[in-house]
């Protein structure tokens, strides 16, 4: 029996000292009834299948292209049984939804304009190595299955993840390698022929972020910070990898692709309609587009539109949809020409001007942290909630990440644009915007050990006219600081746009800072950049052009940095350091117990831990390494729970107010470490040593105490991480207390 005829090609990605990755594409074996199907292997360990199918009849009643992308994560791919009640896969995970968006964004603009047949791309993850991510692999296999389907599609499209590790851009990095990365980018593009006949990679989509460990790598280990220049170099570094992936896909398609079928297209309008609308509307529309306020401007634009439709009703009877579409195109052309010729935008701003900014914290009562950030008519409310680490999100996905301490949710109610609509579960767009804001802030969050809280951040888009996602980054920074979260640095975000066209025979580019919603819709690029004063923390780029010159992109990045620094200054006026934690927020402290004592703290069937929680009102959770997190609404309850835990697991654990004759074991520039008992040291700060030097200022610790010296000390404070702060007990204090105690004893 003859087997299926399989067509295959390989792309070999050379990462130098990091080795090679092999991506093998093949078709002809699986899902043969789909219009186009393709499979991909990553190093022979991970396997994805993509199938592209088109509806037989066009949906000519639609005024958009009905493309659907679905990603199916199969638990068997990772050797798991689903954790749901019915033990089968249910709704897609956040990771799957974000992958759908990564695929959709470069695929959608690559179809012929005017296509109205329903197109569905389904990517199934069927085998996955635990150290690999599947999202960029999915972009490539979805591109190939679509290229093979006979649809009018201008692919192939290559997608690559590159990470900056040890100063080198590494393609398709493993999760284990990403621990050493400072920046992580997903870049998608296609190969185009330039004006001089050479080939280049046109970047279509970028999704990038600084990693969770980037701050420590940069500050402590001297790693390269992801500045604008470094990011621009990374985009160039991605191009050869994309070209290799496109080459392999094209090799398969050259043999196995179906001929492009004749699909009916439905252009928005004919040239005669456009010309008539332009002549009838341009004068009034030009004036309407110069109105500053969004609501007033849109009201006037609608009035002009209705007048034009009435004027042309007889000449174009039955072609009302064409008139409306042509009116929108005239509006787009007028906006673009004004920007390129006069350097003036819809609301009268210059190209690099930012709308009026305002920032305010503590806007809601009782919540743990809140802030209101406004940029023009975009208004975002940020709200922070803190809780114990056991409330962090547990993830049942194919990736090795099983929990998430920082959760960012974004809500976009219909009233934010003055419209009615469905309210309920989040749409893909809301999930994507929340994920972008989350990635922008993760690099500056305090370490888990330093701030043992689960953090939920909610961004409410109360008003929308341009980049609510970047407004969410700003509002979230303010809200987190208001909640007392010790961020390593403040983060702000800005949305950039690009308009390009031929003016007087030459191609001109205009980068726009802080774009409006209309500039996003009518422009050629949506480029969101978030970061601190020092480096970039997140980027999202979508472009409708075949490619953006590197110089233009570098200029947009620099323009974005200038805007970001200005916004950070405005935010600093509202709050520039963490506030005291809200009285309604839980107080969380930690204590370390020996691993072999964990069972005693829990007790049979949880008896001991439940009793402590009942007696003190505190919540207690215990990690496998013996770290005990104690959370309570006030300090005394938390301290009572800590004392109860110590009584079981650390019976000799010191408490505040206890005195010891300790031994100096180490001196530093800021104080001396004193051993109170085996394995338990405390810090005697240099400011406290004045008591031992007759009240004189101490500049050198060794002038007062030396290693091996005995010192009488008292425990003044135990910080949330269990570290002890000591104060010296001088002879006069000790004798005075002894004298005061004698009459009581008599």
From Swiss-Prot:
GO cellular component, as recorded: cytosol
Keywords: Cytoplasm, Magnesium, Metal-binding, Nucleotidyltransferase, RNA-binding, Transferase
Cell compartments where the protein resides: Cytoplasm
S1 motif domain residues: 657-729
Enzyme class: transferase
Keyword Signal in annotation: no
Residue span(s) of domain KH: 586-648
Listed NCBIfam families: polynuc_phos, pppGpp_PNP, PRK11824.1
Its job: Involved in mRNA degradation. Catalyzes the phosphorolysis of single-stranded polyribonucleotides processively in the 3'- to 5'-direction.
Protein name: Polyribonucleotide nucleotidyltransferase
Organism: Kineococcus radiotolerans (strain ATCC BAA-149 / DSM 14245 / SRS30216)
Gene name for this UniProt entry: pnp
